[in-house]
Amino acid sequence: MAVPQPLGQIGDLARRPQAAGFSGLLFTEAGRTAYLNAAVASQAAPGLELSTGVAVAFPRSPFVTACTAWELQEATAGRFRLGLGTQVRTHVVRRYGMAFERPGPRLRDYVLAVKACFSAFRTGTLDHSGEFYHLDFITPQWSPGPIEAPDPKVDVAAVNPWMLRMAGEVADGVHVHPTGEPGYLKRHVLPNVAEGAAKAGRSPSDIAVIVPAMTIVGDSDEARDTERESVRAAMAFYGSTPNYAFIWDEAGFEGTTARIREKQKAGDFKGMAAQITDEHIATFATESSWDGLAAALAKKYAGIATRIVLYNAVGDEERFERYGEVARRME
């Protein structure tokens, strides 16, 4: 998993994990554009699977997103996955200036509209009429045209039961939240995805469960202590979002997210991190030596995750190589 960087740096960023043995690279989206980063990476590291994980859906029309994904699928010879998410109201309305009403149903319609565009690029006929998007006009001049690769897979970020069912019904994969510990995955993700798949006459195995695994790894207490503090800060950030509170509550940490939000409102960022105990970290992250990490992740997510994203696989060349060895052991 990588945060988008200046485009001039992406070539090296993509080549390093490929050389280390990773099968793919996933770009998040924040201040920079995940799609542009993926485009540069596709030329710098041919053969590497690339994903947006996740791109913000609503600021772009379904047609624009479909065209971009289509070109990336062509550029990667069929190794691109389109990951989409709603973001939250404040960002979509106040930063992007777009509508956010009923984000779940809107994203469902968005995914179907994107897939209708994929079909139109092959057939020349665009026909999607949904609750939020109506697309019925395309000409050869405004179509990217057919490609040899299959249609891109479309994955969605989902946390609550409705969104998980929607993912099972219309998407090709679901991006689980980084705090998605195994209990949450078993209680909510797998059964709701299966229910959505059944509604659409699909098999649950058709939907990839994509899990970002936070890791604390090192061969000494000192090395792991440093990583633990980094994970603690990330967990404090995630704990400040009300929509994720039920995951913490069900894991036995009721009230933790409320305390984190109190510290956030007061501007006490150190206090936010101080609310994260070692017990929280043991639940939501995986701690191990380098030699034991692959086995620890495989054991933790066996029968749950289809794909594991190494959330903390960043750093210098040696660190990339060691995480690459972990990735190879898990294949």
Question: Could you say what each language-model-derived stretch is?
Answer:
Residues 1-331:
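Active-site-adjacent structural elements that line small-molecule/cofactor binding pockets in enzymes
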